[in-house]
Design a protein with these regions (language model features):
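Extracytoplasmic
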Residues: 51-53, 61, 73, 83-87, ...
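Flexible, gly/ser-rich surface segments that form the specificity/activation loops bordering the active-site cleft
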Residues: 97-158, 173-184
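Bacterial N-terminal signal peptides that target proteins for export
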Residues: 1-9
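Terminal peptide-recognition signature
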Residues: 56, 62, 66, 90, ...
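C-terminal cap/linker of serine protease catalytic domains
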Residues: 24-31, 97-98, 174-245
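A conserved glycine-rich beta-strand in the N-terminal activation segment of trypsin-fold
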Residues: 35-67, 71-81
């Protein structure tokens, strides 16, 4: 399940809600599961019918990150909803799963998108990250920066992950548009497609608070015990978000 985003930053693009339909904005391929990050399948409604599923990314042995709009329809137990971004933390059994560390991404960096495809297998798309913007006409991103990339995604990948070249989780997939778009000042990004994720760096304080509350432990203790929770990610200051107009 994947939602598209409607914004005044996007010009002359037909938008569709992706509830009960199948949309693809570019080529993906099956992931090499021997070295790909672990991605979980989340059934929504009737599995494999009309895109009736989402994805999640293991965070700890007990918790995963996914899209909020997926978590609201999935059968998993929700630990926390982000108050303004399309992200949620849910309970899942992630023992023996590969836990990708959380990380950062910079403009023009190469990224990969991972999620569960129509066949129930993990798929991957490749592209680059451009910038963060405000989608002022979107309920999902009215108060949350939208990170723009051109890596392809499709229905079912919502809640899956965006990863940098180091294999670090830099965002949770939220939505798509089929074409590039212009900023309000008329500049064109030159992107063939528009895929959107929520940056893990932007929500790192919420992630830390949610994990601490769940385990009843402070972050320093958790960092020492959980490979995906690194001091480099959680202790460095989060940069101020300056959305492009």
């Amino acid at each position: 399940m994947l939602r598209t985003l409607r914004s005044i930053f996007v010009i002359a693009i037909s938008m569709h809600l992706l509830t009960g339909c199948i949309l693809i904005n570019g080529p993906t391929e099956y992931a090499n599961e021997t070295n790909a990050p672990s991605i979980n399948y989340l059934p929504i409604g009737i599995p494999f019918v009309l895109g009736g599923h989402g994805s999640s990314v293991p965070l700890t042995e007990d918790l995963s990150l996914t899209a909020k709009h997926v978590a609201k329809l999935d059968y998993s137990t929700v630990v926390a909803y982000h108050p303004s971004c399309d992200v949620a933390i849910i309970k899942e059994d992630n023992r023996n799963k590969r836990l990708a560390p959380l990380g950062r991404v910079s403009a023009n960096d190469n990224v990969k998108t991972y999620g569960i495809g129509f066949s129930g297998k993990a798929i991957v798309g490749e592209g680059k990250y451009y910038l963060d913007v405000n989608f002022v006409d979107s309920s999902l991103f009215a108060n949350c920066p939208a990170s723009i990339m051109d890596a392809p995604i499709q229905s079912g990948m919502s809640g899956g992950g965006t990863f940098n070249e180091k294999g670090e989780l830099v965002g949770i997939i939220s939505g798509m548009s089929g074409s590039g778009f212009k900023l309000l000042d008329g500049r064109e990004l030159g992107n063939e497609r528009t895929s959107v994720f929520v940056s893990t760096l932007h929500i790192k304080d919420w992630i830390a608070d949610s994990i601490e509350n769940y385990y009843g432990l402070d972050m320093d203790t958790l960092i020492a015990d959980v490979p995906s929770l690194t001091g480099d990610f959680f202790t460095n200051k989060t940069p101020t978000f300056n959305p492009h107009p």
